[in-house]
Amino acid sequence: MEPTLEGQRVCPSLEGASNWYSTSFNPATGLYYVQTNDKCGVFTKIPAEWEAGKGFMGGSFVQAPGEPAQRVLRAIDLQTGKIVWEVPQTGPVTSWGGVLSTAGGIVIFGDDSGAMAAADAASGKPLWSFQMNQNWKASPMTYEFDNKQFIAVAAGSAIITFGLPD
């Protein structure tokens, strides 16, 4: 599909689908967890010629006007390819944070509102949310130190770490 002078609508867009964000698989549930951006865009061709030594894009991209975007955490059954559950999020669809699933049956993710959130790995039921007011560009990770488990994420200009209860 080629861009046109009038603009070509494309779904998912350049910033849509599952792009940068880490995914996670939980062998206990058989589910694959992925953050997705349901977002369409318009690609426009610019009638300009390439010249050596000058920047050239050949066109432009904008979010499809009048079409609100939506960030959604999805759990997919790898045996069937069917979506088992979804957690729609509220926000500007600018977060690029991925997901972390744990042996304890939770999925931790960066909600598009800027919060760190957790959902039940089997049902998708929201469990908790902590507003960090940060735009996520990384995925949560877990580690152990001195026999204590931690969850950390780089969000905004900070690295935020939570100690989990024993």
Where are these regions (language model features)?
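Extracytoplasmic/lumenal domain signature
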Residues: M1-R9, K39-T94, L100-A103, V107-D166
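Signature of short aromatic-glycine-proline-rich micro-motifs recurring in repeat-based ectodomains
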Residues: E6-S22, G98
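A general structural signal for short secondary-structure junctions and capping/turn motifs
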Residues: L14, S22-N26, Y143, I151
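Short, surface-exposed loop/turn motifs at beta-strand boundaries within globular domains
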Residues: G16-S18, F25-P27, P68, T80
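Substrate-binding clefts and catalytic carboxylate motifs of secreted carbohydrate-active enzymes
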Residues: Y21-S24, A28-Q35, G41-V42
